[in-house]
Amino acid sequence: MSNYIVTFKDGVSKDEIQKFKDEVTSEGGEIGHTYDGLISGFSAKIQPQTLQAFQQQASISDSVIETIEPDSTVTIQ
């Protein structure tokens, strides 16, 4: 399992986001942090098959998913 940040387009309901979080956990993944400020989304350890399903969903033009990015540490020098 790898860590990813999944963000959603403006106007996506908390219930819709929860469906994606539930899918992560039902497939054995773990939710890390939930973002509900300037961006809506969550970080999670996601199983490969769940990641693939999310990526397919994100490729659809009317998808609610904005981005799926590998989670990483950002430093400022």
Q: Language-model segments: which ranges?
A:
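Intrinsically disordered, low-complexity segments enriched in small/polar residues
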Residues: 9, 26-30
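Short amphipathic alpha-helices in soluble, non-transmembrane regions
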Residues: 17-27, 53-62
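Short structural boundary motif marking the start of a folded domain
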Residues: 1-4
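Short, surface-exposed ligand-recognition loops at beta-strand->loop->(often short) alpha-helix junctions
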Residues: 7-15, 46
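Autoinhibitory propeptides
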Residues: 32-77
